[in-house]
């Protein structure tokens, strides 16, 4: 594609040299070290450094041109202005150029975007599962991986950056996908990564405290999430949780004809449930929808998973799936790695061990409440908080674990560059003096100790890492999987 054709999609680009206008662009790169001959380098401003400052490296590697911010030009003035183009809005420039270069793949798919603090991964997996059951080829992008039939790649971000995202959407189109289901993070929305993606369905699950290391406060966090439901993104229907305070605000802000609300118990919502019966292996009941009512049996436990189920049902109903087909598929849903995932080494195991990604106050509370009915003995919670992230949630999570678990093990969870002991102290500040938690900084030892101390009927909940198979210590990522350590401890326990 010619450079002038790409830049014609952007209204904030200046200084395009005529000599370069008809040059063929072979690829788009945002990493200067990855540039090769014929590439266009887009230097994106970051929170710590402006990537545009590295345009000389990109040009030296063969890039035909660099698009950077005026600030990057000012800090690193080009000696040859013919190769450096400035943009006053790098976010829009990057998204628009990437979409154009890859042939606007988002317009060739029916896209579903799911945003919210908790529930994105389970909801997107449910939507993908239902669409697949209807024999509709679907691409899934989210926290765990990007995948479609015949392809799977581990994810590095919940929502890819614009260039990678458009490339993956184009690959999905080429693979024959008709639908794309995407977790859309607040970071992605604030940074404009999904500009150029017209969503047929937008789902809002909930908003609770998280990412306040990035967003200035909860209102800023909400404003980022709400962008998904603006005309820039949403072209079809919004599916919104009416049981969430922020969801109620969104419902009021949008045109009623564009919204389906959902609620587990409120019959005034567009989608709701009745006749709920909670069992050790799941829930049964009736789902009420704008397309009719249907009985269901779900293997997922917990109130929050009922919300996830309603959201996914609403999304695929809007996309045209048959309600009875959906209900028939629900019992077959295999679950999601690291979400209420049971670790069992034999059928006669006398304790429950559950691994879950719960890493916010709300998700930890939901996990503990969901697990309680199925644990006849003591509930033992092993958890920590990530370093270089929102510090204000740490004492809140400590308080929740102290109140809802019978035994709390406070340990490390990706301390990154922070002092692990300081993180533990922040958590302990929220635990009342009347509760005596076990503090073990080494997560492997904490998991082993909790499982070896467990008595028949007890349940050990390993919270925070879920599907992750790594631990970040300083700037180093080492292999660490809660499930592996749990299996090792269970095997050791059997020999005692």
UniProtKB/Swiss-Prot annotation:
Residues annotated to bind UDP-N-acetyl-alpha-D-muramoyl-L-alanyl-D-glutamate: 32, 158-159, 185, 191, 193
Residues modified as N6-carboxylysine: 225
Matches recorded under HAMAP family: MurE
Family label: Belongs to the MurCDEF family. MurE subfamily.
Tagged with keyword RNA-binding: no
Main location: cytoplasm
Example GO molecular function: magnesium ion binding
Catalyzed chemical reaction(s): UDP-N-acetyl-alpha-D-muramoyl-L-alanyl-D-glutamate + meso-2,6-diaminopimelate + ATP = UDP-N-acetyl-alpha-D-muramoyl-L-alanyl-gamma-D-glutamyl-meso-2,6-diaminopimelate + ADP + phosphate + H(+)
Residue window of motif Meso-diaminopimelate recognition motif: 413-416
NCBIfam families assigned: murE, PRK00139.1-2, PRK00139.1-4
Entry GO terms, CC: cytoplasm
Source species: Trichormus variabilis (strain ATCC 29413 / PCC 7937) (Anabaena variabilis)
SUPFAM superfamilies: MurD-like peptide ligases, catalytic domain, MurD-like peptide ligases, peptide-binding domain, MurE/MurF N-terminal domain
Role description: Catalyzes the addition of meso-diaminopimelic acid to the nucleotide precursor UDP-N-acetylmuramoyl-L-alanyl-D-glutamate (UMAG) in the biosynthesis of bacterial cell-wall peptidoglycan.
Gene3D superfamilies per the UniProt record, alphabetical: Mur ligase, C-terminal domain, Mur-like, catalytic domain, MurE/MurF, N-terminal domain
PTMs per UniProt: Carboxylation is probably crucial for Mg(2+) binding and, consequently, for the gamma-phosphate positioning of ATP.
Name recorded for this polypeptide: UDP-N-acetylmuramoyl-L-alanyl-D-glutamate--2,6-diaminopimelate ligase
Binding-site positions, meso-2,6-diaminopimelate: 389, 413-416, 464, 468
Localization terms from the record: Cytoplasm
Biological process (GO), any one: cell division
One matching Pfam family: Mur_ligase_M
UniProtKB keywords: ATP-binding, Cell cycle, Cell division, Cell shape, Cell wall biogenesis/degradation, Cytoplasm, Ligase, Magnesium, Nucleotide-binding, Peptidoglycan synthesis
The protein's annotated pathway: Cell wall biogenesis; peptidoglycan biosynthesis
Cofactor(s) in the UniProt record: Mg(2+)
Binding residues annotated for ATP, in chain numbering: 116-122
PANTHER family: MUR LIGASE FAMILY MEMBER (PTHR23135), UDP-N-ACETYLMURAMOYL-L-ALANYL-D-GLUTAMATE--2,6-DIAMINOPIMELATE LIGASE MURE HOMOLOG, CHLOROPLASTIC (PTHR23135:SF4)
EC number(s) on file: 6.3.2.13
């Amino acid at each position: 594609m010619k450079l002038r054709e790409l830049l014609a999609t952007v209204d904030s680009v200046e200084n395009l040299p005529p000599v370069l206008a008809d040059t063929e662009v072979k690829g788009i790169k945002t990493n200067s070290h990855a540039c090769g001959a014929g590439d266009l380098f887009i230097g994106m401003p970051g929170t710590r450094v402006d990537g545009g400052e590295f345009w000389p490296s990109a040009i030296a590697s063969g890039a035909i041109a660099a698009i950077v911010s005026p600030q990057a030009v000012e800090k690193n003035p080009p000696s040859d202005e013919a190769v450096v183009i400035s943009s006053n809005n790098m976010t829009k420039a990057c998204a628009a150029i990437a979409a154009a270069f890859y042939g606007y793949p988002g317009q060739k798919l029916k896209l579903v975007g799911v945003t919210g603090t908790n529930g994105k991964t389970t909801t997107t997996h449910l939507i993908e599962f239902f669409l697949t059951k209807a024999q509709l080829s679907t691409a899934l992008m989210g926290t765990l991986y990007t995948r479609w039939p015949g392809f799977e790649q581990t994810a590095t971000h919940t929502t890819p950056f614009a260039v990678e995202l458009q490339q993956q959407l184009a690959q999905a189109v080429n693979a024959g996908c008709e639908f794309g289901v995407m977790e859309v993070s607040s970071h992605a929305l604030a940074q404009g990564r999904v500009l150029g993606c017209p969503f047929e369905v937008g789902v809002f699950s909930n908003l609770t405290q998280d990412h306040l290391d990035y967003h200035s406060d909860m209102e800023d966090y909400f404003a980022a999430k709400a962008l998904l439901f603006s005309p820039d993104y949403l072209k079809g229907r919004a599916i919104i949780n009416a049981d969430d305070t922020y969801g109620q605000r969104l419902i009021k802000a949008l045109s009623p004809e564009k919204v389906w609300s959902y609620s587990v118990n409120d019959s005034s919502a567009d989608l709701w449930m009745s006749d709920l019966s909670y069992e050790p292996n799941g829930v049964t009941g009736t789902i009420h929808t704008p397309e009719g009512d249907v009985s269901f049996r779900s293997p997922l436990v917990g109130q929050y998973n009922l919300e996830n189920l309603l959201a996914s049902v609403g999304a695929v109903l809007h996309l045209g799936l048959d309600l009875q087909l959906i209900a028939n598929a629900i019992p077959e849903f295999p679950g999601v790695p690291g979400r209420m995932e049971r670790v069992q080494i034999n059928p006669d195991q006398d304790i429950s061990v559950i691994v879950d990604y719960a890493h916010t106050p709300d998700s930890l509370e939901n996990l503990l409440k969901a697990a309680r009915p199925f644990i006849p003995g003591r509930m033992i919670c092993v958890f920590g908080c990530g370093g270089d992230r929102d510090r204000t949630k740490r004492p809140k999570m400590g308080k929740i674990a102290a109140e809802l678990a019978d035994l709390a093990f406070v340990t490390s969870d990706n301390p990154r560059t922070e002092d692990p002991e300081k993180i533990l102290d922040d958590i302990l500040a929220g635990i009342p003096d009347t509760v005596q938690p076990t503090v073990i900084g080494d997560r492997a030892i904490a998991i082993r100790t909790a499982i070896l101390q467990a008595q028949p009927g007890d349940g050990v909940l390993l919270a925070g890492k879920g599907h992750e198979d790594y631990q970040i210590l300083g700037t180093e990522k080492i292999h660490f999987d809660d499930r592996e350590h749990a299996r090792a401890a269970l095997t050791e326990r059997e020999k005692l």
